[in-house]
């Protein structure tokens, strides 16, 4: 690594992913590189790329605007994987072919090449790799789009997926870190990306960093609601209110830097939009959301009427929700269902206070002794709400939801809404994840608008839309998995390129202490290209 005076810090903590700004600067003079590879973003995909390159002996510099690592992963849940040891232990019979058919059917137009590669390699490339670093998966749960349970969770959610990878990265002497530094531009020389311009967020000073390759691992743009709506899928109405549910760093600055350097975008109108957002009471602007739910509740629109199957798939509920004006609904439930209300996120799992921060907060929840009073407080038509609850309760008594098919004869019907006090919580659609992004080839190299490789630039993780596997409709666990996979594959591509440039074998891999044995490459670039061709 070339000489520079940046302060590198190594410590294990949790945080948000990198945010960047756009632009590119053309360079002409020959400058000694600061690293062989610069990775922008210390989230799951960036750390995976760094560790894989570290094993190849590559000199890596990881740059992040925060003082800590973690990324959007800290808001995430689990990983979808196929035919894993944990599935086998639990008696879950699975196969690559079954997973491929499930996912292609669900996503409608997921990238078939990457889907095929993922289902055939997720065990080796993801499960075996992370468990070799100390990750422990403790449960596998069913999820939409899957005929068997494939959604793997660690104890303590995704934090326990990130930290072992981060600890591994910290153990490698050839990986350095530059914190509190915001990547703002890509450097170009004769059409090749050769580095970045970074701004020290504490001093305000800007510097250039040079490398043979740059890996952008900057995440999505789902915090930028205007950009989400400007790139909304054409056959769905745009919601008139959309809350923010992504990490604060998901501003799309990586997209801006890549496109300023000539990269193309692909599937940019694909978003994973949640339908269960409640305004965060801690946000004075009421633009950010918490994700919440109550499986026992009934939902009504602004007219006080049910409008969807509350137990349906998110993709169907979203289509129904964005057609409402306004694009909002109220969860209606009674006192017997209060304990069924939950808010996602570690800070909300247990609340020692006697007062619930949502249910006992008049700004977030309306509560009344009668449905008529509740309707008045929520701004809903009283007669319509009372009629909707009455019809709903009658269908529960009859054992069949003839309006929206939530339950059928023989199903366990939800409880009736009949015990005061009654609750109404207003809900909104929420941004979450990008399912499209920077266009890439089979080696994770960014492509320009002509489909040609943009030399020196790689895009991994959510920045490339999680490999396009999610297609039109997202799959649970199909964001963290592609983050790891794409980070590793980009690193393998770079290792092969650097080795070829030296006309010699790659440097010896660095052993990771948590591994049981000597590391072995799981695939070659030729294998990947043959599969994806």
Show the residue positions of the predicted features.
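C-terminal motif of bacterial Sec signal peptides marking the signal peptidase cleavage site
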Residues: 21-23
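Helix-rich C-terminal "cap"/substrate-channel and partner-interaction subdomain
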Residues: 326-422, 490-493, 497-532
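A glycine-rich dinucleotide-binding beta-alpha-beta segment and adjacent secondary-structure elements
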Residues: 185, 384-468
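Glycine-rich loop(s) and the adjacent beta-strand/alpha-helix scaffold that form part
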Residues: 205, 209-278, 477-484, 489, ...
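Conserved N-terminal/central alpha/beta ligand/cofactor-binding core
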Residues: 58-59, 65-176, 180-185, 226, ...
